[in-house]
């Protein structure tokens, strides 16, 4: 439905745009002043259907060329011929901008009605676990939580819905836990914003089946492994296409947003790691962000937004931490970032605290403020907060730190174990 609305809107916009661009005021006056009376020419009737940007541009070119045939002035014909290339570029840009506008409409509507995105992670493997479902539903019905983050592609390389992506037939990695109808049924609990978590460049199954697409260990002569994790080469076109295809299908299940996790290089200085492109700052940042840019365009065309999970320290580190995550670059290519500002993950002494985990409010405030001090729009930052190894009071302090900075927030707990007292009750 979103796609249809986008197409209808683009046709209307295109028509208005052509009338203005093809016949600017000075040209209309010039035509009217011509001594030769232009013959009546019936404008060809063209049915314009826009299933893709490529077809869209073909139709525009066809329409423009037919208008050229109706012009008798050689001066005018040359003028329009020179403009043709510029028109195509401008219309393509307009099409993408309006796809972005439409992708943002539902989000903006939700934010207006609910003020904040307040979410918890729901482990996709547990989607059909009755006890877990009841626990999550209780959180949703009794507290101000209004958002769920649900796995569609996991750290193990499993895809949790029925997919038509080609590589799945080789990988045998479907572990179906939910359908489109079941995702839609979640909204019967309450008005929810739904985010699909998709693990990107960490995939043991893909790395083992397609070793040429993985980060390679030249010492062991096999795909590089780090603590049991296998990383894919971010520059691989095959890997990128695989991920984007999964993301598009996940969007069509009814999710509002796709969230990329492990959108990075391995966090290791292992000298035996080998990549298709030189492992330096420029290549890392370019490979990550060109992929994000491509993904966002595809997802906006489907009506979904794109976010990226990042390490918390990139809010403070002004380089890329050796993993391709540079703050200023990455925020330009996604709709939101979710830095994982878990106090327990900061080293002793961070932000002046010997034990950061004991100071959740202060540590999270300091980390997020570092990003704001670098000029990052607070509306682009939606942190993942710590929902593990913390008391209910600690979790509330995590939330308070984000809320005091007027930021949305998500809570991470790998087992999706949450207690009502960690959140604001609806009656409060």
Locations of the language-model features?
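Active-site-adjacent "subsite" loops/lids of carbohydrate-active enzymes
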Residues: 112-127, 184, 201-249
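The substrate-binding groove and active-site-proximal loops of carbohydrate-active enzymes
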Residues: 118-127, 164-177, 227-241, 278-286, ...
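Aromatic-lined carbohydrate-recognition surfaces of secreted/lumenal glycan-active proteins
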Residues: 121, 193-203, 259-260, 282-324, ...
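Catalytic domains of carbohydrate-active enzymes, especially glycoside hydrolases
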Residues: 133-158, 251-257, 333-336, 405-410
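Aromatic-lined carbohydrate-binding/catalytic grooves of carbohydrate-active enzymes
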Residues: 143-177, 267-269, 273-274
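Conserved, mostly hydrophobic/aromatic
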Residues: 148, 194, 243, 250, ...
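Active-site-proximal loop/short-helix segments
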Residues: 157, 164, 204, 209-211, ...
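Substrate-binding cleft of secreted/luminal carbohydrate-active enzymes
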Residues: 334-348, 360-428
């Amino acid at each position: 439905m979103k796609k249809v609305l986008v197409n209808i809107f683009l046709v209307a916009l295109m028509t208005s745009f052509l009338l203005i661009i093809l016949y600017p005021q000075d040209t209309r006056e010039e035509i009217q002043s011509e001594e030769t009376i232009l013959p009546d020419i019936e404008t060809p009737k063209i049915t314009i259907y826009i299933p893709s940007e490529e077809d869209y541009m073909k139709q525009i070119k066809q329409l423009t060329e037919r208008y050229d045939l109706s012009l008798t002035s050689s001066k005018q014909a040359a003028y329009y011929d020179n403009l043709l290339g510029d028109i195509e570029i401008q219309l393509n840009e307009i099409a993408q901008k309006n796809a972005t506008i439409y992708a943002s409409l539902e989000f903006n509507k939700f934010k207006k009605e609910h003020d904040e995105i307040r979410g918890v992670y729901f482990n996709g493997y547990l989607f059909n676990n009755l006890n877990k479902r009841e626990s999550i539903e209780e959180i949703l019905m009794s507290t101000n939580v209004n958002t769920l983050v649900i796995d569609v592609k996991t750290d193990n390389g499993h895809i949790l819905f029925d997919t038509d992506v080609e590589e799945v037939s080789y990988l045998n990695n479907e572990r179906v836990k939910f359908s489109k109808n079941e995702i839609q049924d979640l909204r019967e609990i309450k008005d929810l914003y739904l985010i699909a978590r998709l693990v990107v460049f960490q995939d043991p199954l893909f790395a083992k089946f397609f070793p040429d697409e993985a980060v390679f260990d030249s010492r062991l002569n096999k795909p590089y492994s780090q603590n049991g994790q296998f990383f894919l080469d971010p520059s691989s076109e095959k890997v990128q296409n695989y991920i984007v295809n999964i993301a598009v299908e996940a969007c069509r299940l009814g999710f509002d947003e796709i969230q990329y996790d492990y959108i990075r290089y391995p966090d290791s200085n292992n000298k035996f790691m080998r990549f298709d492109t030189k492992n330096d700052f420029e290549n890392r940042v370019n490979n990550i962000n060109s992929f994000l840019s491509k993904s966002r365009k595809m997802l906006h065309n489907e009506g979904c937004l794109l976010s990226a999970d990042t390490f918390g320290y990139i809010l403070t580190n002004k380089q890329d931490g050796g993993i391709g995550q540079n703050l200023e670059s990455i925020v330009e290519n996604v709709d939101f970032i979710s830095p994982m500002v878990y106090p327990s993950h900061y080293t002793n002494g961070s932000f002046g605290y010997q034990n950061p985990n004991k100071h959740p409010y202060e540590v999270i405030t300091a980390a997020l403020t570092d990003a704001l001090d670098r000029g990052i729009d607070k509306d682009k930052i939606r942190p993942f907060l710590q929902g593990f190894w913390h008391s209910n009071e600690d979790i509330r302090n995590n939330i308070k730190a984000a809320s005091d900075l007027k930021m949305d927030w998500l809570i991470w707990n790998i087992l999706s174990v949450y207690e009502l007292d960690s959140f604001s009750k609806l009656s409060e």
